Regions:
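Glycine-rich phosphate-binding P-loop
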Residues: 21-34
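Short internal beta-strands
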Residues: 50-52, 174-177, 202-208
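Charged helix-capping and loop-helix junction motifs
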Residues: 157-165, 188-191, 216-222
């Protein structure tokens, strides 16, 4: 079995980065962001995989991530699925094998790392705005994006939450939230809960809304002001509203172009960090 410690690797010239995408709620845009970010990285020569280990109530999210990475099978994107639109811990007759899910994710991490090693002699140069290049001879990092279900404390199995997933993987968090009134409190609560569980937060991504309210003008700045000092935190980023078809797999390529600049900023900000820790239990500290 491949362990998280084995895969939280950093050498002088090759890294594997694992990010857990968590929302401040369900339906806030995690899948759209994850899919577009994955496609952007792939288009720019970065070994990447985007997965949603747990999914319930419809396969639209799975299909979006499949399309983002070029027609992968469901088993390459999703570990556990239920038709019931409830948290995995509440789904009848389909108990979650949490350790099995971790082993499945680690096998994907190994595959991403192996793929990136195969690109070691190449220099990745993007063709569009914000394209990626080798910097100082450093190879592009392999990236695994693991999308959670619901919020950070959404239950997955007995005694296990989405936070437990991040702890088991030693992943950095990307917090995705809707840019609307109320988001400041939701983001601060999520970050506080993450910190109490020993989880690092890489960045916050605010997703534009169809009908922007006045708060959207200041939410990002106020979140920056009120967040506590966080080791390794790279910033708050704003995604524009991409239209009612943002979750349409057929629009992935078009939408990546629309948000190419901010995707490049997020990648450049988040990729240069030390290795994550692992083995932290899902209990508040301090």
């Amino acid at each position: 079995m491949v362990s998280s410690d084995d895969l939280n690797l950093m050498t002088d010239d090759l890294r594997l980065e694992t990010f857990l995408l968590v929302g401040t709620d369900t339906g806030v845009g995690k899948t759209v962001f994850s899919g577009l970010f994955a496609r952007y990285l792939m288009d720019n020569g970065v070994g990447v995989q985007a997965v949603k280990p747990f999914c319930a109530g419809g396969k639209a999210d799975i299909e979006f991530l499949q399309a983002a990475r070029g027609g992968l099978g469901q088993e390459e994107v999703n570990y556990w699925y239920s038709e019931e639109p409830v948290s995995p811990a509440a789904a009848e007759l389909k108990a979650v094998d949490f350790e099995g899910a971790i082993n499945w994710i680690n096998s994907l991490r190994s595959a991403v790392f192996s793929h990136q090693e195969g690109l070691s002699g190449q220099v990745a140069v993007g063709s569009g705005q914000g394209g990626l290049q080798s910097v100082g001879g450093v190879r592009q990092a392999g990236v695994l994006l693991v999308e959670g279900v619901g919020g950070l404390l959404a239950p997955l199995a007995k005694g296990r939450t989405v936070a437990s997933l991040g702890q088991a993987l030693g992943a950095q968090l990307i917090v995705v939230a809707p840019n609307r009134v109320g988001v400041i409190n939701h983001v601060l609560l999520t970050v506080e809960a993450a910190a109490k569980r020993g989880l690092g937060v890489a960045c916050v991504v605010l997703m534009g809304q169809r009908e922007a309210d006045l708060s959207s003008l200041d939410n990002a700045a106020l979140i920056r002001d009120f967040l506590p000092e966080l080791a390794g935190f790279k910033g708050v980023f704003e995604f524009p509203w991409l239209g009612v078809g943002a979750d349409n797999p057929g629009q992935i390529g078009v939408n990546v172009k629309k948000v190419e600049k901010v995707l490049a900023e997020i990648y450049e900000a988040c990729r240069l960090r030390g290795p994550s820790g692992s083995g932290v239990t899902d209990q508040p500290s301090g």
